[in-house]
């Protein structure tokens, strides 16, 4: 049996190349209106992305509202009221990574709930940052 509009309960959106155009590096106005229409119909809308919430604040317009956000590839999920789920990397794994970085340094980003840190940046990191339009 084919799915009807009434069968749709939720819609999940990626950020890069879905909400944000790779060409214009912005969310089209038509997308903002379409998501608002979905929400008016009672359809839940979610962002599912590898990005950090800090980046979403910079990239998504304030007028674009979602019911919840699944960030960092599902490692940090929240809505407007609460954090729903977190999956931090175990401390032993972090210690192992720091040892590897001491022995063989390479650019690495460390992410907390509220901040992002990088041990150092090189030309490749700068190029990737430009490509994904994030600071």
Give the positions of each predicted feature.
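A general structural motif
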Residues: 5-8, 42, 66, 105
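Substrate-recognition element of Asp-dependent hydrolases with the DxDx(T/V) motif
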Residues: 35-57, 108-113
């Amino acid at each position: 049996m084919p799915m009807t509009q009434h069968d749709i309960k939720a819609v999940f959106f990626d950020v890069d190349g879905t909400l944000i155009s790779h060409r214009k590096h912005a969310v089209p106005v038509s997308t903002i209106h379409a998501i608002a229409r979905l929400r008016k119909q009672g359809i839940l809308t979610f962002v599912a992305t590898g990005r950090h919430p800090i980046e979403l604040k910079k990239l998504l317009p304030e007028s674009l509202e979602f019911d919840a956000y699944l960030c960092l590839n599902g490692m940090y999920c929240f809505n407007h009221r609460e954090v729903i789920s977190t999956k931090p990397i175990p401390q032993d794994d972090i210690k192992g990574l720091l040892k590897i970085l001491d022995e063989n340094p390479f650019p690495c980003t460390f992410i907390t709930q509220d901040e992002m840190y990088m041990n150092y940046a090189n030309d490749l990191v700068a190029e990737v940052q430009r490509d994904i339009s994030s600071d």
